[in-house]
């Protein structure tokens, strides 16, 4: 019996063959969701816990960079990947510099390249989750220490007044 995939990957591309090929290539390691539009991708993000988002740059209504920018705000821990068969170099550079994407892939890709990139994205997701958990733990610890300092200050005032 095969293990249940740990990470969910959303592929957004208006060309169904792309989503199908990514699904066929990665379905043993990842739960792969496919969307043919940004609107469908947003709905799948709303309905599922998605860890990795892959989107094409050139789509109707909205570019991949615009879509990933929106997803960064709504789902900051999801690792965002952009791919294109065209040389939209300025848009890609801007997206990378603004932190909207983790990785850029050029179509067509080699299967090994795609598998490695998605595995790296899954590892990055795990790092981000661990980092968020550690940050939360440290905030709780700081809060507890502040409470303890307040109690000690009150005790010092009480002892000085006695």
What are these regions (language model features)?
Residues 87-90, 109-118, 122:
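C-terminal output helix
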Residues 48-54:
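Active-site beta3 strand of CheY-like receiver
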Residues 43, 65-77, 94:
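Short amphipathic alpha-helix used as the core "switch/output" element in two-component signaling
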Residues 59:
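Receiver (REC) domain active-site loop signature in two-component systems and cognate sites
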Residues 4, 16-34:
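Two-component/phosphorelay signaling modules centered on CheY-like receiver
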Residues 126-162:
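C-terminal output/effector regions of signal-responsive regulators
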Residues 56, 84:
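Active-site residues of response regulator receiver
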Residues 34-43, 64:
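Helix N-cap/capping motif at the beta->alpha junctions
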């Amino acid at each position: 019996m095969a293990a249940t995939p740990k990470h969910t990957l959303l592929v957004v591309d208006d060309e169904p063959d792309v989503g199908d090929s990514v699904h066929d290539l990665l379905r043993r390691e990842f739960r792969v969701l496919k969307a043919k539009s940004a609107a469908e991708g947003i709905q799948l993000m709303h309905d599922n816990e998605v860890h990795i988002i892959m989107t094409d740059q050139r789509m109707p209504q909205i570019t991949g960079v615009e879509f990933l920018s929106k997803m960064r705000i709504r789902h900051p821990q999801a690792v965002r990947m952009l791919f294109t068969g065209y040389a939209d170099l300025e848009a890609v550079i801007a997206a990378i510099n603004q932190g909207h994407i983790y990785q850029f892939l050029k179509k067509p890709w080699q299967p090994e390249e795609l598998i490695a990139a998605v595995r790296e994205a899954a590892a990055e997701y795990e790092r981000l989750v661990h980092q968020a958990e550690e940050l939360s733990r440290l905030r709780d610890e700081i809060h507890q220490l502040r409470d303890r300092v307040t109690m000690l200050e009150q005790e010092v005032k009480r002892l000085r007044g006695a």
